[in-house]
From Swiss-Prot:
PROSITE patterns: PGLYCERATE_KINASE (PS00111). Keywords: ATP-binding, Cytoplasm, Glycolysis, Kinase, Nucleotide-binding, Transferase. This is Phosphoglycerate kinase. InterPro entries: Phosphoglycerate_kinase (IPR001576), Phosphoglycerate_kinase_CS (IPR015911), Phosphoglycerate_kinase_N (IPR015824), Phosphoglycerate_kinase_sf (IPR036043). It comes from the Bacteria. The lineage of its organism: Bacteria, Pseudomonadati, Pseudomonadota, Gammaproteobacteria, Alteromonadales. It comes from Colwellia psychrerythraea (strain 34H / ATCC BAA-681).
């Protein structure tokens, strides 16, 4: 993959427009998780230290285009950056006709989605953004799967278009995990539905040595294995797909192991009583919410022998502690492994935080949808345009 990197360019006195993913959760004007902001800071500091005139843009939430709303403002983000950089960062609301920025100064543009044409990748908007800068830096892996004016269009028209350190790092880590992995390659895919991750499972079943499924996804595989899943969340219409995927994995000398024991309850609530039982004893009124210790132990052994681990999704309803032991054991096994490990997806990152293993994972991806699309083997539009511009 050949793309120009920000680190290779001389940025002194250059107008540098950086697209970051600063889409953080904000409640009552307060940021509740700063993970994406922390991930973006090294890029911003590098550009500032290089003496660039730095402009930063991002979306936040899903406002109606052309209708600015205070709850979607990047003001809390701007305040956070001011504190983190120990420097007064300006929030600029009218920027499309030009902005005065001094060398060594950083400003933040108000929510890019307040502009008409952002989502549709409108050329007029993209050209206006491109005219603001000498160098466009795409650094938002989390939005790289979307062709929008601020991720794709601007890269088409900017004088120079390159990848920032965060995006470059994501692509290198994912490439290391999927293109030329140390074997055995183990992928752990959790989540509620097979349908939302079918293409991911399809793609991975052909390249991994072991595909571990968890959460609601596992229930469909349990049903495909001939067991009763009671009232569990599962997709009856995808049982045949689950059978096909298992056969596909086996044809590739891999496997998709089905849990031997599970943790069940008769209601979905924080106070539900958890019961451990063999997978073939689930009754009609029960729901599966976690894997049992026997299954967790077997998966721990698979993880311990891995050369590369890709983790996307918890294996149980870990938000409730009585159904969190499976995810906790898996998380700890990944943390204890010497394999190259990469974790991505919102729920996965929440589990990484809960069990405090962030420093034990080789690479934590900031992307949700982009991470999944990369796993599916899809081209990311915002990366593709950078490749074209590098030629």
């Amino acid at each position: 993959m050949s793309i120009i990197k920000m680190a290779d360019l001389t940025l002194a006195n250059q107008r540098v427009l950086i697209r970051e993913d600063l889409n953080v959760p904000v409640t009552d004007g307060k940021i509740t998780s700063d993970a994406r902001l922390r991930a973006a800071l090294p890029t911003l500091k590098l550009a500032l230290e290089a003496g660039a005139k730095v402009m930063v843009m991002s979306h936040l939430g899903r406002p109606t285009e052309g209708q600015p709303e205070e709850k979607f403002s990047l003001k809390p983000v701007t305040d956070y950056l001011s504190a983190a950089l120990n420097y007064p960062v300006r929030l600029v609301t009218d920027y499309l006709d030009g902005v005065d920025v001094a060398a060594g100064e950083l400003v933040v543009f108000e929510n890019i989605r307040f502009n008409l044409g952002e989502k549709k990748n409108d050329d007029t908007l993209a050209k206006k953004l491109a005219a603001l800068c000498d160098v466009f830096v795409m650094d938002a892996f989390g939005t790289a799967h979307r062709a929008q004016a601020s991720t794709h269009g601007v890269a088409k028209f900017a004088a120079t278009a390159c990848a920032g350190p965060l995006l470059s790092g994501e692509l290198e880590a994912l490439g290391k995990a999927l293109d030329n992995p140390a074997r055995p390659l183990v992928a752990i895919v959790g989540g509620s539905k097979v349908s939302t991750k079918l293409t991911v499972l399809d793609s991975l079943a052909g390249i991994v040595d072991q595909l571990v499924v968890g959460g609601g996804i596992a229930n469909t595989f349990i049903a495909a294995d001939g067991h009763n899943v009671g009232k569990s969340l599962y997709e009856a219409d995808l049982v045949e797909e689950a059978t096909r995927l298992t056969k596909q994995a086996k044809a590739n000398n891999g496997d998709i192991p089905v849990p031997s024991d599970v943790v069940v309850a008769t209601e979905f609530s924080a106070s539900a009583t958890a019961t451990l039982k063999p997978v073939n004893e689930v009754t009609a009124d029960e729901m599966i919410f976690d894997i049992g210790p026997e299954t967790a132990k077997a998966l721990t052994e698979i993880i311990a022998n891995a050369g590369t681990i890709v983790w996307n999704g918890p294996v149980g309803v870990f938000e409730f502690d009585q159904f969190g032991e499976g995810t906790k054991v898996i998380a700890q096994a990944i943390a204890d492994s010497s394999a190259f490990s990469i974790a991505g997806g919102g729920d996965t990152l929440a589990a990484v935080d809960k069990y405090e293993i962030a420093d034990k994972i080789s690479y934590i991806s900031t992307g949700g949808g982009a991470f999944l699309e990369f796993l599916e083997g899809k081209k990311l539009p915002a990366v593709e345009i950078l490749e074209q511009r590098a030629k």
